[in-house]
Every structure is written in structure tokens, then in C-alpha cells.
Amino acid sequence: MPTPSASSPQPKGFRRAVSEQDTKQAEAVTSPRFIGRRQSLIEDARKEREAAAAAAAAAVASAEPGNPLEAVVFEERDGNAVLNLLFSLRGTKPSSLSRALKVFETFEAKIHHLETRPAQRPLAGSPHLEYFVRFEVPSGDLAALLSSVRRVSDDVRSAREDKVPWFPRKVSELDKCHHLVTKFDPDLDLDHPGFSDQAYRQRRKLIAEIAFQYKQGEPIPHVEYTKEEIATWKEVYATLKGLYATHACREHLEAFQLLERYCGYREDSIPQLEDVSHFLKERTGFQLRPVAGLLSARDFLASLAFRVFQCTQYIRHASSPMHSPEPDCCHELLGHVPMLADRTFAQFSQDIGLASLGASDEEIEKLSTVYWFTVEFGLCKQNGELKAYGAGLLSSYGELLHSLSEEPEVRAFDPDTAAVQPYQDQTYQPVYFVSESFSDAKDKLRNYASRIQRPFSVKFDPYTLAIDVLDSPHTIRRSLEGVQDELHTLTQALSAIS
């Protein structure tokens, strides 16, 4: 089986075949699992991208042959059509431009912007220029205007305006990031373990209401968990904790001990998000925010940019304690929270979020896939051994065993490769990516993110909890002033100890 380093064979005790494991472990790896698909950010991001592409294709397909509006992209605004138009002039005489502009005057079009550009497709005998005009005209006159422009100009075509998708600029705007993916809701999915359990469904609605009513900055309301919910937690907690010493990474183990000491992590009590959020805030600046289910990929990643982790409060159904088709508090509290208490990993998580702000649907899908193979199912090397750091592994007994057995393929982490790697959401992953260290993974991610096409860069301001959009010399200079202040403080500190 390929591994990142052939010169460093893995200890037999950590990468064993399923057949070599004890009976309980073997059953956990091979036992039937919940047959519904696990929810994932990748699936949601893919659907968003495909929906946008389908809408664009439908618009083109619906255009009638010979229609002047065929393949023309415009925006409806108060009965007017607003669009960008590109065209080339016929001939080189100045009167050619006059004739073209006369058309806009005749139809009383309001011109917002006019400029010349180097022609992308220069015509023989014509100047190597084309004209870009953004204008507004009554919608009923648009077809006639375009027909007239085509009679006096060449290569007439509309240009879609590149719009940057909305993203929150202030932490308070996370209240708008609430788009849930409900495919695996117990009220809707026949295969969900809780579908036929009316009491469970009502309980989920009650807990979900906390998230729906929550506003950023408020204390997170406590949940009084039932005896059955605590019993489910106890089974998951005790089973997974028995594996952590040999399978979890060093950072997870250290944070888990602190959580047991300060946040009430124990078998007979489910920790409250408010207490855990205070703990994380003091450690790495991350905060928790209650959420009713799986958020859309764009909304979830945007939250990470503010060091806010959207966290569920409900618990999986008692009939399926070792597996859940959706994120629940076992997954969040046992898998994600300990890792978010590590400074380097917290920065890695925030970097993924920052890279997502204003990114295209295609890039969101790729970032979601990188997130899947790192934050959810990532492995790392420590002291020559493979260890798990992904929350999907650290909250699933069977997959944790599987990931460190000899069954799956293990590859060195490379964001470009991971971003397009097919993923598995019906059974265990056949492929995992291993990082040399969290610092190495962070550097590789930043290099990958620097190549995402956006007309700006972004920076998180920890004082105002806001996103600084760096899109002008002024905003960059202002950001540099803050860096200079920090460097001055560090220089003084070095002088004091030297």
C-alpha cells in the first residue's frame, strides 16, 4: 500500500489488517452501518455549483432562434434592462462610432459607462479596438436596440458582470449565515434512525429552536439532556476514549485532558456549548455558535473565517450510537473541539474560511473537499507513526480503526490533489491524506489559497471581529500600520531579553 514515506514503515500495532484486530474492533470496522449517505460540505457545494450551471444553461436553451435577445445576459431593474455590451466598429471612419452611439440616443438609453478596450477578436481592416458600454434601457426596447446596434457594428455580444458572492464582513452578520441542508432531517429522510421515533423528532425540533432564535454574541442557552441522551453519550464517550491513547494525535490528547478538567467532559454528563466556547475563546480565540443542522458549505466556511465554529446541540439516535448520518454533539465535542484548542490547527481552520470569502462555487466545492480530507478525515505523522486528527475519525470508532489499519490508501497531503479527490460518504474512506505537521499543512493551504482568483484579499481583524477587504492601496497601507505596530512590540521584547 502506498504511504507518504516508504523509508518509515508504520508500526504493526497501528496499521493492522482488520483480520488481525480483536473481535470488538473487527465488528466495528465491518458491521453494517447506517445506509443513508452522510451529509457533507462537499455534496452541498457540488449541488450549488451544478444548480448555478444548470440555471445558466437553461437561460441559453430557452432563447428562441433568431431572437435578438438570444444569449444576451441582462439584469431587470424597475422595468428597465441593465446590461454590458461589447462591440467592434465597421470601418475606420469616425462616423462609425457616431452611428453606433446614435442608436443608444434614439432609444433614450442611459449610459453608465463607456470605454475602449483592445479587441479580443480583431477583424481584418478594422481598428484593433472594441467598445464596452454599460447602459440601461426600457426592457421593451432592448430587442430593437440590439438589432439596431448589430446593423451598424460587428461582433456584438453581452458580457456578464463578474459579481463576487456575498459574504459576511462583521461577526454579527453570521446571523445571516443560516442556510441549512435538510436532506437527512429525521422528519424528511425515511432511512434516518429517528424517522419513526416521534419523541426523538420532537426533541430535535425543541433543540433546533435554540439555534434558530440565537443571535451572535448572546450566551448559548443550556440544554437539559435526558437520561437516554446521556446514556448514548456515555457509550460513545467510553468507547472512543479507549482508542484515543493509541490512535489520536498529541494535540487532541492534550486538549482532551484539559476539557475533562475544566469543561465537564465525562461519561455521565454532556458538556454545555457555552462552557466549551469560553474554554476555546481563552485558548485560541475560537467560539461556538449553536446550529440546527448541517449548514451550506459557503455559510459554514465563512463562519470559520471569524473563528466561529457552528456546533450542533442535539445527539444522535440511541439506536445508532456508533454512527450518525449527520453532525451531532458527539461529533462536534469529541472530534472538533479538542483540535480547535490547538493554536496551529485553529489557524489552519480559519485559513480555509478566509479563502472561501467571495470565492466562486467551483472554489467552494474544492475548499470543502480539502476540508473533508483534513479537518474531517485527516491523518498526521508523529514520532514515525500515523495518528488521527480529523473529527470524522475521532468521533467514529469504526472509521478510526479503519483509517489506521492496512486497508485504506494513505497519500501525502497536497491541497491541489485533495481538492479534486473523489470522496466516500456511504462507507469508510478508501483514501486518506497525511500531513507532516499542522504547520506544514497550513503553509501548503496558504499557497493553494493564494491562487484562488478574487479581485481582493482579506484579513481578519481580531480587535473588531471584522473582515478587512484589501482591495486598494489605502486598505493595504492601513493593514500594514497594524503589522508595523506588532513588529515594534516584538522588537522591544527581543531587546528586553537580549
Curated annotation (Swiss-Prot):
One of its GO terms (biological process) is memory. Disruption phenotype: Homozygotes deficient mice are deficient in catecholamines, and usually die around embryonic day 11.5-15.5 due to cardiac failure. Increased number of persisting retinal hyaloid vessels due to loss of hyaloid vessel regression at P8. SUPFAM superfamilies: ACT-like, Aromatic aminoacid monoxygenases, catalytic and oligomerization domains. Pfam families: Biopterin_H, TH_ACT, TOH_N. Expressed in the adrenal gland. Expressed in the retina. Expressed in the in the striatum (at protein level). The modification Phosphoserine is found at residues 19, 31, 40, 472. Residues 1-10 have a biased composition (Polar residues). Inhibited in feedback fashion by the catecholamine neurotransmitters, especially by dopamine in competition with tetrahydrobiopterin. Phosphorylation of several Ser/Thr residues in the N-terminus regulates the catalytic activity. Ser-31 and Ser-40 are readily phosphorylated to activate the catalytic activity. A Cysteine modification induced by N-ethylmaleimide (NEM), inhibits tyrosine 3-monooxygenase activity through the modification of the Cys-177. GO terms for cellular component: axon; cytoplasm; cytoplasmic side of plasma membrane; melanosome membrane; neuron projection; nucleus; perikaryon; perinuclear region of cytoplasm. Its main location: cytoplasm. Keywords: Catecholamine biosynthesis, Cell projection, Cytoplasm, Cytoplasmic vesicle, Iron, Metal-binding, Monooxygenase, Neurotransmitter biosynthesis, Nucleus, Oxidoreductase, Phosphoprotein, Synapse. Residues 1-33 are annotated as: Disordered. Phosphorylated on Ser-19, Ser-31 and Ser-40 by several protein kinases with different site specificities. Phosphorylation at Ser-31 and Ser-40 leads to an increase of TH activity. Phosphorylation at Ser-40 activates the enzyme and also counteracts the feedback inhibition of TH by catecholamines. Phosphorylation of Ser-19 and Ser-31 triggers the proteasomal degradation of TH through the ubiquitin-proteasome pathway. Phosphorylation at Ser-31 facilitates transport of TH from the soma to the nerve terminals via the microtubule network. InterPro entries: ACT-like_dom_sf (IPR045865), ArAA_hydroxylase (IPR001273), ArAA_hydroxylase_Fe/CU_BS (IPR018301), ArAA_hydroxylase_sf (IPR036951), Aro-AA_hydroxylase_C_sf (IPR036329), Aromatic-AA_hydroxylase_C (IPR019774), Eu_TyrOH_cat (IPR041903), TH_ACT (IPR049321). The keyword Oxidoreductase applies. Homotetramer. Interacts (when phosphorylated at Ser-19) with YWHAG; one YWHAG dimer bounds to one TH tetramer and this interaction may influence the phosphorylation and dephosphorylation of other sites. Interacts with NT5DC2; the interaction results in reduced phosphorylation and decreased catalytic activity of TH. Catalyzes the conversion of L-tyrosine to L-dihydroxyphenylalanine (L-Dopa), the rate-limiting step in the biosynthesis of catecholamines, dopamine, noradrenaline, and adrenaline. Uses tetrahydrobiopterin and molecular oxygen to convert tyrosine to L-Dopa. In addition to tyrosine, is able to catalyze the hydroxylation of phenylalanine and tryptophan with lower specificity. Positively regulates the regression of retinal hyaloid vessels during postnatal development. This is Tyrosine 3-monooxygenase. It comes from Mus musculus (Mouse).
